[in-house]
Amino acid sequence: MTTIKLHNTRTRTKEEFVPIDPDNVRMYVCGPTVYDRAHLGNGRPVVVFDVLYRLLRHVYGADHVTYVRNFTDVDDKINARAAERGRPIGDITAETTQWFLDDMGALGALEPDHMPRATQYIPQMVAMIEELVAKGHAYEAEGHVLFAVDSWKEHYGKLSGRSVDDMIAGARVEVAPYKKNPMDFVLWKPSTPDLPGWDSPWGRGRPGWHIECSAMSYELLGESFDIHGGGNDLMFPHHENEIAQSCCAHPEGHFANFWLHNEMLQVEGKKMSKSLGNFFTVRDLLDQGIPGEVIRFVFLSTHYRKPMDWTEKKAKEAEATLRKWWRLTAPLDEMEIKPSPQFIDALTDDLNTPGAIAELHRLAKEKDYAALEAGLEMLGLQETVNFGVASFGFSTSVEVLEAANDLARRWMAYRDAKNFEEADRLKKSALLAGVDLSVSKEGGIQVPSATINGSPTVDELEALK
């Protein structure tokens, strides 16, 4: 069987991945808190772990991999957003959850096998907290229940490589008079009548952030599973606290064997910030006409453990490359394809996506279009709606883009069938409507030109078929 090697944050080494059960490979990735649009940085872990999910399915079989990514739908940020907008909390979370799914779908991400909402697992959280209290790892104080870090002191901080004393001195923690130790963190907090709350042995309240992932992963994957992933910013305190809770509540297990963390994202060499004017949501870029596949390509062009810099230049280069590759692989729809061994070697070496992309460049140069298509598919970069139609020079609806895309397919089909009379007829008609169907130097279809005959409409393009 193919060997996968992954960098394990827990051991700080690249290790051979050996699943607990090859017939039931299990992965948990921390998902979003649903109160706003996903920004560009939120998209990176989704794409990274989507590629890992695809690789695991390739190696172990789609029916033998379980991927869980949660939604945090109870949180003080959500409460604040609902109050700010004067809308019910449930409306905010439902709307934002769908936004996230739509935007990540546009980035080519497969939906995980399970997408639990925190509010669906409150009883499991209460049960885990009760277990921690009973075992002396948690205590009640002024309506709160807190995890006692001193009860796990010899292990706490190993993931992030910090000592408890150093963390007390320098970490950002909530200091409250009811804490026995400044590092103790909230498992349960009281709720006022205007905030979401559930009945519990400690009164009406709501869970802390960290207990949510521990309870959901235990319920869906068990006390021991293979991989836990997330952004580097979650390593401390979130992942550190998850380990403490889960291992203390279920000492018979060892929680996650492998921990993977992706690095952060910059924009044009600077930290993404609203104050700098370089803060983008995924939807912002999609609405600017940047295809989701292009965003994904830029993400994958940098190794997941290195900081990534989003630039306009990279986006343009990615688009040109993808359109060329899509043109080369267009006639292969009915062929049986499989990725090249070198492509798989790159991905199995700690998700070396830049190396995998370099292999795709080689395959294109060597005219191995079947392996190129297979590699694109495995990276989630196969063509979708935007096939062959370069960026419009004007604001273009999805409907117009799809109609132009259909013309491109028909034109190429005529050419491939050597029906040059019909190909020429369609080319001339399309040109009059504002779409130049000649092949560009990048291998794609030339842009529709507003200078030819204005912006084409769907009806005009449909009439050409």
Curated annotation (Swiss-Prot):
SMART domains in the record: DALR_2
Pfam annotation, one family: DALR_2
UniProt-recorded Gene Ontology molecular function terms: ATP binding; cysteine-tRNA ligase activity; zinc ion binding
Reaction(s) this enzyme catalyzes, per UniProt: tRNA(Cys) + L-cysteine + ATP = L-cysteinyl-tRNA(Cys) + AMP + diphosphate
Sites where the protein binds ATP: K274
InterPro entries named in the record: Cys-tRNA-ligase, Cys-tRNA-synt_Ia_DALR, Cys-tRNA/MSH_ligase, Rossmann-like_a/b/a_fold, tRNA-synt_1_cat_dom, tRNAsynth_Ia_anticodon-bd
Keyword RNA-binding recorded: no
Transmembrane segments: none
UniProt motif 'HIGH' region: location: 32-42
One GO term (biological process): cysteinyl-tRNA aminoacylation
Keyword field: Aminoacyl-tRNA synthetase, ATP-binding, Cytoplasm, Ligase, Metal-binding, Nucleotide-binding, Protein biosynthesis, Zinc
A GO cellular component annotation in the UniProt record: cytosol
Cofactor(s) it depends on: Zn(2+)
Protein family per UniProt: Belongs to the class-I aminoacyl-tRNA synthetase family.
Subunit structure: Monomer.
Protein name as catalogued: Cysteine--tRNA ligase
Native species: Ruegeria pomeroyi (strain ATCC 700808 / DSM 15171 / DSS-3)
